[in-house]
Amino acid sequence: MLAFCYSLPNAGDVIKGRVYENDYTLYIYLFDYPHSEAILAEC
């Protein structure tokens, strides 16, 4: 499990979450937003 801390570019808030893998896909789970799992994509 990989933990991360991401600073939003347009706000002073820092988002903390967890990155996990399921069926060869990386997902992000945000601790402050429990229903907001997202697929991790490189932009």
Swiss-Prot record:
Cited InterPro entries: K3-like_poxvir (IPR016397), NA-bd_OB-fold (IPR012340)
Record GO terms (molecular function): peptidase inhibitor activity
Domain of life, per lineage: Viruses
Similarity comment: Belongs to the orthopoxvirus OPG041 family.
Name of protein: Truncated K3L homolog
Organism (species): Monkeypox virus
Lineage, opening ranks: Viruses, Varidnaviria, Bamfordvirae, Nucleocytoviricota, Pokkesviricetes
